[in-house]
């Protein structure tokens, strides 16, 4: 059963079921809006030089819902209250090519939609309590280090960001 949190402006879902890619556009559609931006992430075949067969996602769901709600609220503060935001993340076992995260943002203008979408996925990757156990073709598996440890995030933060401090 999916773990679903919905209000009139955003929908957050953590689910063991496959992600229907049309769900974000359906939720974010509004006749007042002229723009929709989305991001889809899926399991890639090679990571850090190793052949990947799949990923098992785990999460502390109550905290994850809280963090994702905060991220959506921050995006509204920065990019405007006239947004609709959809966030869905897979949990459990996934295979190469499976969609694992879907972000959608509807807005009056494209700049707000695109920037808010980027903000939501970046903050999700760095703040949401979601853990990845990567499975490899050789039968081995290993936990993927948290994204907040990545050098890319530290260097991006030094250049400044569009989000709240």
UniProtKB/Swiss-Prot annotation:
Annotated TM spans: none
Keyword DNA repair: no
Pathway it works in: Cofactor biosynthesis; molybdopterin biosynthesis
Catalytic activity entry: 2 [molybdopterin-synthase sulfur-carrier protein]-C-terminal-Gly-aminoethanethioate + cyclic pyranopterin phosphate + H2O = molybdopterin + 2 [molybdopterin-synthase sulfur-carrier protein]-C-terminal Gly-Gly + 2 H(+)
GO molecular function ontology, one term from the record: molybdopterin synthase activity
This enzyme's EC code(s): 2.8.1.12
GO annotation terms (biological process): Mo-molybdopterin cofactor biosynthetic process
Keyword entries, A-Z: Molybdenum cofactor biosynthesis, Transferase
Binding residues for substrate: 42-44, 109-110, 125, 132-134
A Pfam family: MoaE
Record's subunit section: Heterotetramer of 2 MoaD subunits and 2 MoaE subunits. Also stable as homodimer. The enzyme changes between these two forms during catalysis.
Protein task: Converts molybdopterin precursor Z into molybdopterin. This requires the incorporation of two sulfur atoms into precursor Z to generate a dithiolene group. The sulfur is provided by MoaD.
Name under which the protein is recorded: Molybdopterin synthase catalytic subunit
Organism per entry: Synechococcus elongatus (strain ATCC 33912 / PCC 7942 / FACHB-805)
Gene: moaE
């Amino acid at each position: 059963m999916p773990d679903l949190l919905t209000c009139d402006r955003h929908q957050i879902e953590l689910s063991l079921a496959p992600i229907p890619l049309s769900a974000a556009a359906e939720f974010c559609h509004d006749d007042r809006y002229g723009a929709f931006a989305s991001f889809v992430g899926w399991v890639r075949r090679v990571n850090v030089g190793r052949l990947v067969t799949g990923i098992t996602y785990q999460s502390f769901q109550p905290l994850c819902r809280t963090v994702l709600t905060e991220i959506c609220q921050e995006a509204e503060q920065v990019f405007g209250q006239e947004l609709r935001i959809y966030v869905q993340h897979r949990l459990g076992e996934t295979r190469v090519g499976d969609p694992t995260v879907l972000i959608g943002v509807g807005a009056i203008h494209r700049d707000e939609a695109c920037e808010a979408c980027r903000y939501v996925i970046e903050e999700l990757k760095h703040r949401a309590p979601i853990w990845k156990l990567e499975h490899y073709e050789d039968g081995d598996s290993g936990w993927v280090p948290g994204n907040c440890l990545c050098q890319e995030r530290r260097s991006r933060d030094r250049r400044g960001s569009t989000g709240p401090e």
